[in-house]
Amino acid sequence: MKILAVGAHPDDIEIFMYGLLRILKTRGDNIFLAIATDGCQGGDLPKKELVKIRKKETISGLSELAKPYFLNLPDGQLGDNLNHKLKIRNLINKINPDMIITHDKKDYHSDHRILSNFVSEIAGHYIPVIYSETMMGINFTPNYYIDITDVFDIKKKAVMCHLSQKPDRFVNL
């Protein structure tokens, strides 16, 4: 199967989706990864410098899964924007996945919610969309859990690549 994971920010795939993706890769699925925004709002450094740092952290964190696509949409500014939707649609059409994993529509973060709605609107009628758990389960009602115990240490290593984000706070999610 071709699996596409779409995270709103650099580090989202590692925090919310990595365990499942690692299991899917181990069973032989083809993994494709996309980061929607540039991550420029995720710290106190100058925005251009932070974008470069977060991109390097993401490439490192995801290196055992796949090379990510960076859509470079503006962090904190996803909205009902045709250009944003077109970038996501073009990526989905290019990859033509059998399944998409993204954020839940009720996630705590507006970029996560908007991205989830984009993905569902663009592909939800013909591609199964799986929604990841939200931060500490807030507003999330799961209908299935995946045990990631066997890959947890690898997930932790991936999350810890994001030093600019003080990753210790995300390791056990």
Which residues fall in each region the model found?
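Active-site rim/loop-helix segments in enzyme catalytic domains that contact anionic ligands
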Residues: 1-95, 124-125
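Metal-dependent de-N-acetylase/amidase catalytic core
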Residues: 1-4, 23, 45, 79-173
